Amino acid sequence: MTRRVNVGGVLIGGGAPVSVQSMTNTDSRDFEATITQIRALAENGCDIVRLAVHDEACVRTLRRLADESPVPLVADIHFNHKLAIGALENGVAKVRINPGNIGGEKNVRELADCLKTHHAPVRIGVNSGSLEKDVLNKYGGVTAEGMVESALTHARMLERCGFEDIVLSLKATDVRKTVEAYRLASRVCDYPLHVGVTEAGTPGMGNTKSAIGIGALLLDGIGDTVRVSLTGSPLPEPEAAIEILRALGLRAGVDVISCPTCSRTCIDVAGIAKRVQEATRQVKTPLRVAVMGCVVNGPGEAREADLGLAGSKTGGALFVKGGRAREVKGDLYEALMDEIRKRI
C-alpha cells in the first residue's frame, strides 16, 4: 500500500478513494476567470484543481483564490522555487514541481522547509518531454527506467531534507511507456502515484488514450489520484475521469447501460439513455440502469440491472431487480426516472 498524504483535506494514497484532478487554463492572474473555472471544475466532480503559477502577479492572486475555492488548489511551478514558497504562503494545499528545474539542493531545502511549515505535500511530476539530459543520455532516450530514476532521485533529495509527503507522477505521451513507468515505480517505492497520460490530445482520442492508460493501471491496483488531460477546455476532464472510475467500480453513481441498437429497436434508446445520464450525473447512489431497444436481449440485460427498460412495439416494459414490474405506454423516460428517483 502507498503512503498517505493530505491535500487540503483530500487524502491521497494509503487506501483512500481515488481522487480526480484537473488544471485551469485561464490566466492565473485573472481572479474572476480563474475562480469561475475552478468552481465549474468542482461542479463537474473535480476534487483538486491545479493552476500555473509563473510570476509574482499569480502569487498575489492565490490568497483570494484559495479562500474562495470550493476545492484544494495546487500550484504548478517551474524554474523558480521562490514562487512555490510564495504560493504556499498564500494558501495553496500542494505544490507540483518538475525534477531538476527549481535549482540545486539549497533551493530544494528551502522549499522542503516551507512545505513542512504549511503541512503541504509536493508532487514530483516527471514528463517524458522534459527529462534531464543526463538521464536521456544514460538510457539512450525516453524510457520507463529513466523516468522512474528521475522521480526517485528528486524524491530522495527531498527526503534528505527531512520531507516525505511526496507524490510521484510519470507521464508520457505514449500509453505503453506511461503504463510501464508506473508499474515499475509501484514495484520499487511506496509513494502515492498521480496517474495520467500527458498531452493525450483532443476529446475523443485523448479520452481513449487516457481510458486505456489509466484503466490498465487502476485494474492493477496502481494509482491514487488521476487526471484525464485533454486539449481545450478542462471542463470535460473530471467527467471523463469519473467515468473511468465508475467503469472499474471505484466510484459510486448511476451506471447507465444501453444496447447499440439494430433494426429491431422499438424505442429511442440513445435519446432516453443520454437523458438519464444527464439527469443522474451528480447522483452518488450506486445504481445500474439498463435501456434496451427490444424484447430480444432487453429482458435478459434488464434483469442484470437494478432497473431496466426494454422497448416493445406497444411501448416498453419496466424491470426492477430482475423482475418484470409493469408495462409502460406513455412517456418511457419519465416512467424510468420515476423509478430511479425512488432509489436515490
Which stretches of residues belong to each language-model region?
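N-terminal amphipathic alpha-helix/helix-capping segment at the start of soluble metabolic enzymes
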Residues: M1-M23, K116, E278
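Active-site mouth loops of central-metabolism enzymes
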Residues: G15-A33, A52-H54, V71-F79, V135-V148, ...
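Hydrophobic faces of well-ordered beta-strands that scaffold small-molecule active sites
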Residues: V18-T24, D47-L51, L73-I77, V95-I97, ...
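Glycine-rich, proline-tolerant flexible connector loops at the mouths of alpha/beta enzymes
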Residues: N25, D30-F31, A42-A66, R96-G104, ...
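Alpha-helix-loop-beta-strand connector modules within alpha/beta enzyme cores
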Residues: E56-I77, E110-V122, Y182-L193, V276-T280
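Glycine-enriched alpha-helix->loop->beta-strand junction motifs that scaffold or abut catalytic
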Residues: E68-V71, L88-V95, K116-H119, S186-P192, ...
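Hydrophobic or amphipathic alpha-helical targeting/insertion segments
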Residues: K82-R123
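Catalytic alpha/beta core domains of metabolic enzymes, predominantly
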Residues: V126-N127, V135-K284
